[in-house]
């Protein structure tokens, strides 16, 4: 398995989860775990996604998600799991 961590943050509105998961499905990525919450009007989501069988390469998926974030008004970050864990260790 090759996992990435995807974080999504922005003002809450309908369709954010649907749009992000649509891009992942179109690229044959598999959601391993997902957590999402709304804090007042702030949408936050973190996903663990297996990209070992994606139909594109990592950089193409990253660009597609960044473009989607711009289109729907949220910030989407994609990091390999080991980098995410290293950056957020205590």
UniProtKB/Swiss-Prot annotation:
Domain named ACT is located at: 5-79
Gene3D superfamilies noted in UniProt: 3.30.70.260
Listed InterPro entries: ACT-like_dom_sf, ACT_dom, UPF0237/GcvR_regulator, UPF0237_ACT
Pfam family name, one: ACT_6
- Protein family: Belongs to the UPF0237 family.
Protein name in UniProt: UPF0237 protein MMP0657
